[in-house]
């Protein structure tokens, strides 16, 4: 705190104590604040403000009618700043019984720095239109419709058949709150006899650039033949991209992999070969074709090799495995020690703002790779830069998968008990079906049940607090055994009915669509 003396020079510097440890957040509230409690209520309360502050990508929302569930908020942008919050007190001391010039009051100013403001929220956008569900009665009185529309308690059937006035909301609300300049231009005037061109793909301008074709060949399970060689466009594309010795070495390594094993998943390739993802998109169509449906769906198969004609190809079949969760298994989705591949919270909304993250600074040794005389010597190439861990395609007992949904090939199930289930019919394979391939019917169901029990035991060892109630865990285990169809005949009948209308799981379709889009 510092006080200015009455006779001091107004331009003189005054020493002030600065509390560096006290950091504050400023909100430029678009209104006069007379009640702090009501002001915080319009911002969602202290809990909401704290939650938004912890996420730098969130915008602070202000609801002018916090009790109205349909109130459209005004959003504030977040900025970094280096400001001070000052408290200035003006004290006036009047002199009594003094006449003349000396009768002027004595004024002093007390200055105090409360803290440093490092973050500020500014409401720079425009407030959107607020549409109210209000009905005008015959006498001109406005009545709110919320009490008649909103369900605040369980209602009877008559509630849904009551007569209400027609209220049509606007067809669309604005997603942006910042104004933009729109330059109106007159309509284009064509000469007499001009006709608009026919609508076709050549005359349309897309919103984004066209995808680069990677010339992959897709094969369905019903197709009779498989391709023997890649497309000529795929060959030329790879020859143009293969410009250095590293690319040639990657090509040789991938060719050796397909010689050893004719069927590979993309994750398995990434775990065995260090290659840039963009180069892999071009190299895979040059080496193999892609199976869309059947037991080898979402896998890359060597040209000329047809797994439907080789019973020993059953070890390359794919298994869509998902970690089961729920009350009957003893843990929920939030308690699982395995993260999800995707999340809806990763998508941007109008109330969020994208900010580039600060890139950490890196230092490179310019002498690295040089010989003793300073000349360019043999450099140590980082071949493992793009390699993935083998856990993305290999299942091991006692280890949790990296994701909640995994696509394993049967040969990558490194558990003896699982391999016994796969090889139960070795030498007696007769027909290859779309669901089970060369394996016995319901082999995938038995594999999933066995793997789920292993996952349950692993989670129990890593998170024993989730299974403090042993009875619940035992019930979950019994439920797993019941789902496998070993105790009830009715369950077997239901599985037989489901087998007739077999379709690949939604998860596998989503995974294939993601990979197929890279080659369209």
From Swiss-Prot:
Q: Which Pfam families does the protein's record reference?
A: Tau95, Tau95_N
Residues annotated with N-acetylalanine modification: 2
* Superkingdom classification of source: Eukaryota
Keywords assigned = Acetylation, DNA-binding, Nucleus, Transcription
Q: Where is this region: Disordered?
A: 466-520
Protein's UniProt keywords contain Acetylation: yes
Listed under subunit, the entry gives: Part of the TFIIIC subcomplex TFIIIC2, consisting of six subunits, GTF3C1, GTF3C2, GTF3C3, GTF3C4, GTF3C5 and GTF3C6. Interacts with BRF1, GTF3C6 and TBP.
Q: Know the name of this protein?
A: General transcription factor 3C polypeptide 5
């Amino acid at each position: 705190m510092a006080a200015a003396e009455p006779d001091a020079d107004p331009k003189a510097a005054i020493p002030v104590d600065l509390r560096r440890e006290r950091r504050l957040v400023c909100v430029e509230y678009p209104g006069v604040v007379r009640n702090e409690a009501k002001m915080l209520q319009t911002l969602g309360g202290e809990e909401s403000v704290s939650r938004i502050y912890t996420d730098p990508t969130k915008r602070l929302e202000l609801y002018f009618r916090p009790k109205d569930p349909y109130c459209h908020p005004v959003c504030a942008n977040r900025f970094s700043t280096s400001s001070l919050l000052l408290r200035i007190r003006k004290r006036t001391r009047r002199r009594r019984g003094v006449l003349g010039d000396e009768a002027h009051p004595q004024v002093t100013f007390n200055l105090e720095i409360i803290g440093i403001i490092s973050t500020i929220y500014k409401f720079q956008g425009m407030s959107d239109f607020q549409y109210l569900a209000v009905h005008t009665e015959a006498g001109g009185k406005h009545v709110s419709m919320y009490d008649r529309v909103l369900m605040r308690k369980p209602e009877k059937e008559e509630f849904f058949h009551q007569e209400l006035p027609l209220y049509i909301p606007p067809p669309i609300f604005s997603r942006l709150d910042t104004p933009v300049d729109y330059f109106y231009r007159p309509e284009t005037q064509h000469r007499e006899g001009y006709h608009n061109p026919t609508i076709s793909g050549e005359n349309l301008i897309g919103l984004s650039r066209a995808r680069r074709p990677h010339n992959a060949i897709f094969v369905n399970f019903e197709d009779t033949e498989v391709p023997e060689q890649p497309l000529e466009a795929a060959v030329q594309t790879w020859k143009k991209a293969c410009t250095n010795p590293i690319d040639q070495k990657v090509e040789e390594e991938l060719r050796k992999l397909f010689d050893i094993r004719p069927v590979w998943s993309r994750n398995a390739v990434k775990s065995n070969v260090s290659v840039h993802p963009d180069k892999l998109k071009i190299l895979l169509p040059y080496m193999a074709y892609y199976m869309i449906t059947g037991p080898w769906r979402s896998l890359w198969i060597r040209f000329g090799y047809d797994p439907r004609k080789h019973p020993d190809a059953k070890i390359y079949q794919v298994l869509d495995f998902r970690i089961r969760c729920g009350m009957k298994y003893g843990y929920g989705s939030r308690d699982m020690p395995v993260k999800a591949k995707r999340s809806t919270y990763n998508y941007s909304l109008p109330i969020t703002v994208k900010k580039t993250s600060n890139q950490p600074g890196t230092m490179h040794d310019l002498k690295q790779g040089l010989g003793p005389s300073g000349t360019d010597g043999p450099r140590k190439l980082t071949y493992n830069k793009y390699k993935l861990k083998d856990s993305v395609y290999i299942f091991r007992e006692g280890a949790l998968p990296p994701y909640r949904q995994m696509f394993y090939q049967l040969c990558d199930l490194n558990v003896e008990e699982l391999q016994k289930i796969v090889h139960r019919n070795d030498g007696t394979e007769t027909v290859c079906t779309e669901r089970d391939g060369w394996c016995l019917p319901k082999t995938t169901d038995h594999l999933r049940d066995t793997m789920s029990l292993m996952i349950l035991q692993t989670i129990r060892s890593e998170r024993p607090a989730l299974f403090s109630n042993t009875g619940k865990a035992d019930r979950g285990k019994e439920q797993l055994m019941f789902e496998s169809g070993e105790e009830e005949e009715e369950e077997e009948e239901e599985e037989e009915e489901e087998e007739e209308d077999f379709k690949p799981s939604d998860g596998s379709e989503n995974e294939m669509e993601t990979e197929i889009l890279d080659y369209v």
